[in-house]
Regions:
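Repeated scaffold domains used in trafficking and secretory/extracellular systems
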Residues: 70-71, 108-117, 145-158, 193-206, ...
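Short loop/turn segments that connect beta-strands within beta-propeller blades
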Residues: 92-96, 134-138, 179-183, 228-232, ...
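A short beta-strand motif characteristic of beta-propeller blades
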Residues: 97-106, 139-144, 184-192, 233-240, ...
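Conserved beta-propeller blade signature
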Residues: 78-82, 89, 121-125, 131, ...
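An edge-strand/N-cap motif at the start of beta-rich repeat modules
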Residues: 69-102
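Structural motif
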Residues: 87-90, 129-134, 173-179, 218-225, ...
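Ser/Thr-rich, Pro/Gly/Ala-heavy low-complexity intrinsically disordered linkers and tails
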Residues: 17-76, 303-313
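Blade-level signature of beta-propeller repeat domains, shared across WD40, Kelch, NHL, RCC1
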Residues: 261-313
């Protein structure tokens, strides 16, 4: 399904609004105005002038790029990314803090999805172009012009190519690969069972590959599937995620994270033998916030610390 850029889409600037949500194992706390970047009302990460209140870092450290290693701790930084049509956000999957990275610059606008490889190299698509994007600044560099999908992820090395990770996506139910150097698109396979991407795809090294879909025997709107990253076909359906138009999907430590067209953020976990989604409240969001995509590094932990997570076949 293609995103439609309508009058309800808000274009945000860097520091225009930042959400943070508190921790908790089963209960997701809400978002507060706090930006890891901090700053004055008129500076990067600043606030106040736009009516959303002042932003400060509360003494926190600026986050490195997604999936990178914190030098002082030697541990992975649990960052995943989401975006509206024009603005890049980041979510710390441990603290549940979300901050604005900034508006996309360099010519990319109406961005329809993002994908991040194991080294935190990130790519975004619009309907007419493929771009590389800097996760620290949201600056885009054009790679190629063509027709590109709104379901985008890298899959691990050895899946479609023995030597490199492959950038993949869905056009409806058609599974495709995109060359990150030339932008060339190649058909790989298809999703059967009457499902079509709604949607977004995310894949993890040593873990699963997941897709949000519509249709199928459940008349999904939306459901979460495990798919085979070699063929793009169905492995299993987990059922409804209780949200429609889940245009953004990311993953960290055994749980998925959904970002929908209505501006909602939620976690997706496996609880007592069934899929369970927990909304992450967004108090005082900007009017008409709409998420159009999300992504996480393929080197994200595939399971929780206790080994739990969404079960795979």
């Amino acid at each position: 399904m293609r995103r439609v850029l309508g009058l309800g889409v808000v274009v945000l600037t860097a520091g225009a609004v930042v959400f943070a949500c508190g921790g908790g194992s089963n209960k997701e706390a809400g978002f507060a105005a706090s930006d890891a970047a901090g700053g004055s009302p008129d500076g990067p990460g600043g606030g106040g002038a736009d009516g959303f209140g002042a932003f400060s870092d509360g003494g926190s450290t600026t986050f490195p790029e997604g999936g990178s290693v914190a030098p002082e701790a030697g541990t992975p930084v649990a960052l995943i990314y989401a975006h509206s049509a024009d603005t890049l956000y980041r979510l710390d999957a441990n603290s549940k803090q979300v901050a604005v990275v900034g508006p996309f610059t360099g010519g990319c606008s109406s961005v329809i999805d993002i994908a991040i490889d194991s080294s935190s190299n990130a790519y975004v698509t619009t309907e007419t172009d493929l771009w590389k994007v800097d996760l620290t600044t949201a600056a885009c560099t054009n790679i190629a012009t063509g027709s590109y999908p709104n379901s985008l992820s890298f899959v691990p090395k050895g899946t479609l190519d023995p030597n490199v990770e492959a950038l993949v996506g869905y056009n409806g139910s058609t599974y495709i690969r995109i060359n990150t150097t030339t932008g060339a698109v190649t058909n790989v396979g298809a999703l059967t069972g009457g499902y079509t991407s709604s949607g977004d795809i995310v894949s993890v090294i040593g873990g699963g590959t997941f897709l949000t879909v519509k249709g199928g025997k459940e008349s999904c709107d939306d459901c979460l599937l495990q798919i085979d990253p070699k063929t793009g076909d169905l492995v299993q359906s987990y059922g409804s995620v209780n949200h429609a138009d889940v245009f953004g999907l990311a993953f960290w430590a055994g749980a998925a994270y959904g970002f929908d067209n209505g501006g909602d953020v939620f976690s997706i976990a496996w609880v007592n033998g069934a899929l369970s989604t927990t909304d992450i409240p967004v108090p005082n969001p900007p009017p008409n916030l709409s998420f159009w995509g999300a992504g996480s590094t393929t080197s994200a932990p595939p399971t929780a610390a206790d080994g739990g997570g969404i079960p795979l076949q």
